[in-house]
Amino acid sequence: MATRAINYINKQNSLAPEKPFFMYYCTGTAHAPHHAPKDWIAKYKGKFDQGWDKQREETFARQKAQGVIPENTKLTQRSDGIPAWDTLSADRKKVYARFMEVYAAALSYADYNIGRVLEAVEKTGELDNTIIIYIMGDNGASAEGTVNGTTNEIATAANGVTEDISYLLSQYDKIGGPETYNHYSYAWAHAMNTPFQWTKQVASHFGGTRNGMV
């Protein structure tokens, strides 16, 4: 997708360098399924072993440090129905962390390719003359993966099929690859909506509706 976008930019600049151009670049990321090359997934091995509760705290602290949220902001409580990370078995932690590693890899890979597109604009000499609007999504992070996550979001979301931990462990190395249509646990979705509560499916809370824009 990025390569085609770059070719389009180069073609427009070659044919009519004085003419403005418009591009709508819309990746599937971070909508499920979360897919990424294996080497990108490997970069995040162990990065989420601390779990979703600690991840919320770390994200919240970083948001304050970067001025994304006011200094007096208070972190919302873990929403009802989301288990505390410290109460989970080792197998559950392993599976849940894997889903998040894959999600992070998919997001990073998308960002990398957006960077390639911006570099192409820069090479035309028009970067400072270009308006770039970056919208991160159309809703909050999604809870459709259920508590366990899933390797087949369509079966889970549309038909109510759930996958137990033993099955997910058997699919561990396939998660994020072409044989899966994976989605992470709704607890990770909640963590990704920090500092707000809830997720895409709960529009009464900002966790379901707020999105970043640059």
Features from the language model and the residues they span:
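Active-site-proximal cap/lid insertion segments
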Residues: M1-V214
